[in-house]
């Protein structure tokens, strides 16, 4: 879990637009963010395994 202070800081509008960065909507993690889904890779993986993201399934080839 990310620090509460950093999550709140990311929610505030920055003084300059280039300082804005994405955070996971579930856990607040700033790294490995997937724009299309709005979550980090760890939360994405757990949501996929539970079948909560429609159209996503495990690859096999």
UniProtKB/Swiss-Prot annotation:
Keyword Hydrolase appears in the UniProt entry: no
Name of protein: Small ribosomal subunit protein uS14
Regions crossing the membrane: none
Keyword field contains Cell membrane: no
Domain of life, source organism: Bacteria
Binding residues for Zn(2+): 24, 27, 40, 43
GO annotation terms (biological process): translation
């Amino acid at each position: 879990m990310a620090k509460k202070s950093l999550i709140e800081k990311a929610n505030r509008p920055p003084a300059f637009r280039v300082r804005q960065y994405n955070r996971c909507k579930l856990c607040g993690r700033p790294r490995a963010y997937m724009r299309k889904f709005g979550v980090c890779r760890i939360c994405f993986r757990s949501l996929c395994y539970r079948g909560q993201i429609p159209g996503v399934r495990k690859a096999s080839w």
